[in-house]
Regions:
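Rossmann-fold dehydrogenase core element
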Residues: 154-172, 181, 191-196
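Short basic (Lys/Arg) and small-residue
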Residues: 143
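N-terminal glycine-/serine-/threonine-rich beta1-alpha1-beta2 phosphate-ribose binding loop
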Residues: 1-138, 150-165
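General small-molecule cofactor/ligand-binding pocket signal
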Residues: 72, 99-101, 167, 279, ...
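Alpha-helical packing segments of well-folded alpha/beta enzyme cores
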Residues: 56, 81, 85, 128, ...
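Contiguous beta-strand/loop segments that form the cofactor/metal-binding neighborhood of enzyme cores
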Residues: 180, 192, 197-201, 206-456, ...
């Protein structure tokens, strides 16, 4: 039991008296100041997923002993995953039996839970984050933070109304190697960014599919109404529950799962909080297996000073994001270009490739512009390996890894400390960025400081995500109304406000070829 538990109970009795979430948060913050950094922090697990099992749990354990954190409870609405999760945690190094909760209301009745890790389906992250901070808990929330602006505004408002420490799972912001590259990119040495090319190509018929797990899910074993979490009512569908990444409004698929991390990196490196405009095209071109989310996407972003509008020239640049699940040629690339050369983020190198040569500069009486080569990480080093999460590196080899999928715990008797394996057969495990991001959150929980990947970073990547989804759903160029914090169709002036499509028949994948 956490030291100071009796005091915490007295603070949290406010919840049973029906006190508003802000008052509860104020009481919890008072407790945090009294307890101090040396008191053990009890952590609740919200959602026993593959992302938690394969990456977050082992990453957490890297720092938990030193920083005095421990798992004390687990909440999952599906009885199978709840029981499997309890068994999994008990087999972790230093593990023990944790309290099991059927839902988050039960979880937050447990006074030993002082913070939570949320690793549930995409569309639940924001609302469950709101629940956490209103219950006076600190939270680590997996990416994406939100895929509707309504949810994004709700979690941002909730966090800003408290002093809860909330970190988002865009883990690159805590990685030393990415931080060094960020510092270089913001130093001015690279020159003005003119273009970014982001690519993610795989060929995986089983990507985000879970037919065996789907067959094990029965409505009586879960709480379908809670699963929907504010989405429109619809009949129970085990496939949408387990394979949610393939179906809007539970996920947009490629943008939710893959694009967010890279767009967050662009925004972090450049300081721009959001795109000025987004257009997108794509469809379901090959994997016609009942999914509604696209298997192929191209999205084009215009970035630059917001007050200059869509045609502003100063320091503006274009980002082209392409992804396909149908052919892996081209693999994964993140290339940043200036007039003087390029940053290959996957390799951690800056080269004068494509920069203005002496010959071409002389023609217009200009000076050559050739970047000085830099290698941020020695080839074969741990830092070189860090430039890309383990799941991404595994995909380059075999195209066989899945992230943040509904979890299947090891069979009884399986050693939890062994390397974890995804349902498609590849080792994943914690990457150094995730270890660093969780540690940063844990340290900030103790020190009551803002984490590297904070609520503003999460909100901003959610804006870019929602703009992309709107472009997919409408086929039009979209922008953003800063005054109303809404995605709009057309330019910021003379626009039409976008109405988020969330019914079962009005889907981003509806424009199938």
């Amino acid at each position: 039991m956490a030291r100071g538990g009796a005091s915490r109970r007295s603070f949290l009795k406010l919840a049973g008296a029906g006190v508003a979430g802000t008052a509860l948060s104020a009481a919890a913050s008072s407790y945090a100041r009294i307890a101090g950094a040396n008191d053990r922090v009890g952590v609740g697990i919200v959602g026993f997923s593959d992302r938690f099992r394969n990456s977050l749990a082992p990453a957490f354990l890297k720092s938990a002993g030193e920083l005095n954190f421990e798992f004390v409870a687990l909440s999952d609405i599906w009885s199978k995953r709840r029981d499997d999760g309890g068994a999994f945690v008990s087999k972790l190094p230093g593990g023990k039996q944790v309290a099991l909760a059927r839902n988050n209301e039960e979880l937050y009745e447990n006074k030993d839970v002082q913070a939570v890790i949320i690793a549930t389906p995409d569309f639940q992250h924001a609302s469950q984050g709101v629940e956490a901070v209103r219950a006076g808990r600190d939270a680590y929330i997996e990416k994406p933070l939100a895929n509707t602006m309504e949810d994004a505004r709700a979690i941002r408002t909730a966090v800003k109304g408290t002093d809860r420490v909330v970190a988002i799972g865009t883990q690159r912001r805590s990685s030393p190697i990415y931080q060094r590259i960020h510092d270089y990119m913001t130093s001015g040495t690279f020159g003005d960014l003119v273009s970014v090319e982001l690519t993610w190509n795989v060929n995986q018929p089983g990507r985000w599919r879970r037919p065996k797990l789907v067959s094990q899910l029965h409505e009586a074993d879960t709480d379908w109404k809670r699963f929907l979490t504010g989405r429109p009512p619809e009949p129970f569908d085990p496939r949408k529950y387990v394979e949610f990444r393939l179906f809007w409004p539970f996920s947009s698929g490629i943008p939710d799962q893959w694009m967010v991390q890279r767009i967050d990196t662009v925004q972090w490196f450049t300081g721009f909080p959001r795109p000025r405009s987004v257009v997108a095209n794509g469809g379901i071109y090959h994997w016609r297996d009942g999914r509604k989310n696209w298997d192929t996407l191209t999205a084009v972003f215009d970035y630059g000073p917001i007050d200059e509008g869509l045609t502003g020239a100063a320091k503006g640049f274009q980002v082209v994001y392409t992804a396909r699940m149908t052919n892996s040629a081209g693999g994964m690339r993140e290339h940043y270009f200036s007039n003087g050369g390029m940053l290959d983020l996957e390799k951690g190198t800056v080269l004068p490739t494509g920069g203005l040569t002496e010959e071409n500069a002389r023609e217009m009486e200009l000076k050559a512009n050739q970047l000085t080569p830099i290698t941020f990480a020695a080839p074969g080093s741990e830092e070189a390996a860090e430039l890309g999460a383990p799941a991404e590196r595994s995909e380059r080899k075999s195209g066989a890894v899945t992230e943040r999928s509904p979890a299947q715990a090891p069979a009884s008797g399986t050693a939890a400390a062994a390397p974890t394996v995804s349902p498609l057969g590849e080792n994943t495990g914690p990457d150094e960025s995730t270890i660093a991001n969780l540690r940063n959150w844990m340290e900030c929980v103790q020190a009551r400081k803002r984490p590297n990947s904070d609520i503003e970073a999460g909100y901003n990547h959610s804006v870019a995500l929602c703009m992309t989804i709107a472009a997919m759903q409408t086929g039009q160029r979209v922008s953003f109304d800063d005054a109303k914090q809404e995605v709009v169709i057309g330019p910021p002036t003379g626009h039409v406000h976008f109405q988020q499509r969330s019914s079962r028949t009005d889907l981003p994948g509806g424009r199938e070829p």
